[in-house]
């Protein structure tokens, strides 16, 4: 089974404040395949983290196709312990703004075969962090936030 690693990061200056996300898609050997940076408007750190995961799910589904994703192991790596533990089902969602984002991810996951979320140290997520900070610095609108109406654009 092929394995894809998706590094995601979201950040906010002000929390809530101007927010950005970074997504890096790599093969199982760690070779980068694609990277994305996007400005998210005004969000909290956790909302930005969730938006990055949503974008990653939507993008990998588009890149691989609906059939191939069922036979591909997808490992998300993020440096937000809270978000990774919530997505793995270990922590409750107590913030009502995060619940719809969690549900969106839950529904997107249904199309995938094996998918899991792993918390990693910030040092191992430098590239996604750099992309998120770049988006916040530039107010970059290279992509739109992941949304049901039309999906992401690059």
What are these regions (language model features)?
Residues 11-15, 54-136, 140-142, 146, ...:
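RNase H catalytic domain
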Residues 1, 153-154:
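Short, low-complexity, intrinsically disordered N-terminal peptides in bacterial proteins
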Residues 49, 53:
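Short, conserved alpha-helix that lines the donor NDP-sugar binding/gating region
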Residues 1-47, 58-60:
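RNase H-like nuclease fold core
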Residues 29, 151-153:
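Charged/polar low-complexity intrinsically disordered segments
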């Amino acid at each position: 089974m092929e394995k894809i690693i998706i590094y995601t990061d979201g950040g906010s200056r002000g929390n809530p404040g101007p927010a950005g996300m970074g997504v890096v898609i790599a093969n199982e050997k760690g070779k980068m395949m694609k990277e994305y940076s996007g400005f998210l408007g005004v969000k909290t750190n956790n909302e930005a983290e969730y938006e990055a995961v949503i974008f990653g799910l939507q993008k990998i589904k588009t890149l691989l196709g609906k059939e191939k994703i069922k036979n591909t192991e997808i490992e998300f790596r993020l440096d937000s312990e809270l978000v990774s533990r919530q997505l793995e089902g270990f922590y409750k969602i107590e913030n009502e703004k995060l619940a719809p984002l969690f549900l969106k991810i839950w529904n997107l996951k249904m199309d995938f075969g094996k998918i899991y979320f792993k918390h990693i140290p910030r040092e191992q997520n430098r590239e996604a962090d750099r992309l998120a900070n770049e988006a916040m610095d530039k107010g970059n609108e290279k992509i739109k936030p992941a949304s049901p109406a039309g999906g992401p654009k690059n």
